[in-house]
Amino acid sequence: MSTLGHQYDNSLVSNAFGFLRLPMNFQPYDSDADWVITGVPFDMATSGRAGGRHGPAAIRQVSTNLAWEHNRFPWNFDMRERLNVVDCGDLVYAFGDAREMSEKLQAHAEKLLAAGKRMLSFGGDHFVTLPLLRAHAKHFGKMALVHFDAHTDTYANGCEFDHGTMFYTAPKEGLIDPNHSVQIGIRTEFDKDNGFTVLDACQVNDRSVDDIIAQVKQIVGDMPVYLTFDIDCLDPAFAPGTGTPVIGGLTSDRAIKLVRGLKDLNIVGMDVVEVAPAYDQSEITALAAATLALEMLYIQAAKKGE
């Protein structure tokens, strides 16, 4: 099965350059990369406004504005000198075939993880996290989930492909342990009896970052962690370009500080999802997503440099 294309994809949903202008490598499985970036241009599982399939391209495009900074503030070092990161482009699948996307993404992830790589993925709608969790759980065992979102995505509607059901399905499949997982920024209806610790947007906005991070560390412990960031966790003032925006969210400043605070966790996989550039203003949503993705890489580089 061919998981990725091995030539530049000039379609409307892809770019011919990597995130941060990092090297493109269409054969990442045999590379010496520490982290591999994969775009997943998929939005068939959305329940709101479509357009997330263009998210990976938008994130890469705006990331060129971040590529110039070497000793990034406040880290004061260049992530690229500590981590070998490559961008392998976008998952190639038949648009319109959700099952093929899911199977090919899981196979791609399993192959990367078996080769000793770690993954940072760009959605696409949030459903793409489920096949990624399946692959990571095969490699690392049951994981903790640190989940930034306006929605819990724990809804049991019986639909196989729905971006609001992944974290109902994942515990059922034994992929994640809700009792060691935390959902941050929630501000919509949710089930209080599913085992997850929910830190709603009201308390996240009112409490100190240090206090929140201390609680997250206590909940997660030393389990392997999958970190997923739905961009609608941010308030629409900072991230209007998404399918299901909800007011009352986090500022971009608070989100960045929270992500930086996760440095000491055993993070084994990461994604940023739900950027829909058709609804964006001056690329601020894509810029927020690209910046958060960069901060995720920096926390990995900081750990490697210790």
Curated annotation (Swiss-Prot):
<protein>
    <recommendedName>
        <fullName>Agmatinase</fullName>
        <ecNumber>3.5.3.11</ecNumber>
    </recommendedName>
</protein>
<keyword id="KW-0378">Hydrolase</keyword>
<feature type="binding site">
    <location>
        <position position="151"/>
    </location>
    <ligand>
        <name>Mn(2+)</name>
    </ligand>
</feature>
<keyword id="KW-0479">Metal-binding</keyword>
<keyword id="KW-0464">Manganese</keyword>
<keyword id="KW-0620">Polyamine biosynthesis</keyword>
<feature type="binding site">
    <location>
        <position position="230"/>
    </location>
    <ligand>
        <name>Mn(2+)</name>
    </ligand>
</feature>
<dbReference type="InterPro" id="IPR023696">
    <property type="entry name" value="Ureohydrolase_dom_sf"/>
</dbReference>
<dbReference type="GO" id="GO:0008783">
    <property type="term" value="F:agmatinase activity"/>
</dbReference>
<keyword id="KW-0745">Spermidine biosynthesis</keyword>
<comment type="function">
    <text>Catalyzes the formation of putrescine from agmatine.</text>
</comment>
<feature type="binding site">
    <location>
        <position position="153"/>
    </location>
    <ligand>
        <name>Mn(2+)</name>
    </ligand>
</feature>
<dbReference type="InterPro" id="IPR006035">
    <property type="entry name" value="Ureohydrolase"/>
</dbReference>
<dbReference type="GO" id="GO:0033389">
    <property type="term" value="P:putrescine biosynthetic process from arginine, via agmatine"/>
</dbReference>
<dbReference type="InterPro" id="IPR005925">
    <property type="entry name" value="Agmatinase-rel"/>
</dbReference>
<dbReference type="Pfam" id="PF00491">
    <property type="entry name" value="Arginase"/>
</dbReference>
<dbReference type="GO" id="GO:0030145">
    <property type="term" value="F:manganese ion binding"/>
</dbReference>
<dbReference type="InterPro" id="IPR020855">
    <property type="entry name" value="Ureohydrolase_Mn_BS"/>
</dbReference>
<feature type="binding site">
    <location>
        <position position="126"/>
    </location>
    <ligand>
        <name>Mn(2+)</name>
    </ligand>
</feature>
<dbReference type="GO" id="GO:0008295">
    <property type="term" value="P:spermidine biosynthetic process"/>
</dbReference>
<feature type="binding site">
    <location>
        <position position="232"/>
    </location>
    <ligand>
        <name>Mn(2+)</name>
    </ligand>
</feature>
<dbReference type="InterPro" id="IPR023694">
    <property type="entry name" value="Agmatinase"/>
</dbReference>
<feature type="binding site">
    <location>
        <position position="149"/>
    </location>
    <ligand>
        <name>Mn(2+)</name>
    </ligand>
</feature>
<comment type="similarity">
    <text>Belongs to the arginase family. Agmatinase subfamily.</text>
</comment>
<keyword id="KW-0661">Putrescine biosynthesis</keyword>
<comment type="pathway">
    <text>Amine and polyamine biosynthesis; putrescine biosynthesis via agmatine pathway; putrescine from agmatine: step 1/1.</text>
</comment>
